[in-house]
Amino acid sequence: MGLFGPPDVEKAKATGRIEDMLRAATYKKDPAVAEAGRAALTERLDLLINELGTRNIRRLQISRESLVVVGPPARDRLVFILGEGHVHRRQDAAYMLGEMKDEAAVAPLCDSLRHADPLLRMLSAQALGKIGSPGALRPLRLACMDRDPKVAAEARKALRKIPGGVPGTAG
């Protein structure tokens, strides 16, 4: 990668540096470079998913950002994790699905509002608020009555972000 030029996707692929691929995928001056960067990240989707289990905060953040940039292929994997994974992986999946703001994640996120883990319920409510889909109104209204006050508060915040959402009412 040159100091002032566009990111070198081929070099990033050859070295396996995810961070350089991410830099290329988010390069705004040349759509072809950005697309090549996204394609390189998509090829490493399994690695990115596995990195969600790391304790290295920097690698975790790079993996999260990369998965969001990859888009629909990563979304499908994250939706699966949201329904089947370990609770910490589910929490990560809920967070990233919210960052993606993809309507296809609304139903699985609504389902996770009923999970036993309060942090997962809270992150799912936040994600639904970021997506802003009217399809989440009823589940979020029910979540406003959650036994955990933090979950209920996040559900109310999410409802305020969705057109037609009236906080504090059950529908």
Where is each model-derived feature located?
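Structural detector for internal amphipathic alpha-helices that build alpha-solenoid repeat scaffolds
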Residues: 1-15, 20-53, 57-72, 77-83, ...
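Short, flexible active-site recognition loops that position polar ligands and cofactors
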Residues: 145
